[in-house]
Amino acid sequence: MKRIFPVSLILISLLHLTGCIPNTSTQVPSTAIPEIFPDYTYVTVPSTIAPLNFTPQDTFYTAVIAEFSGTRGNLFRVKGRKNITIPKNKWTELLNANKGDSISVTLKILKEDKWIQHTSFPIYISEHPIDHGLVYRLIAP
């Protein structure tokens, strides 16, 4: 009886974890680079910049997954319903590991029960940190 509880707890935990991972096995490849806002495709950023959260500009999608990978490791995924909000600690580790190189972002969008995998785009990471006195703000056009 004492063994049943730990074993059942482990099984329930595994079922819960696998239930939280979206099934992306039915993917439709797309040769287009995804339209995102703000547009971070092919940009160079300082190595100490805050996470570059974004929103896909596609219409009528129900979920989105972004895969971030560096040429020097640190692959991670972020999922969301409408926005991609990157965890700060994973972002910092990825940038520190890939200073002076680039990271690749692959976007998958769930639309009409099909996952559309867009072409990956790079974000280049400068070796230099962000200037201490740099301040910016968003000004409407």
What are these regions, as identified by a protein language model?
Residues 1-8:
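Bacterial N-terminal signal peptides that target proteins for export
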Residues 2, 14, 138-139:
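Intrinsic low-complexity, intrinsically disordered segments enriched in polar/basic residues
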Residues 8-18:
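Bacterial N-terminal signal peptides
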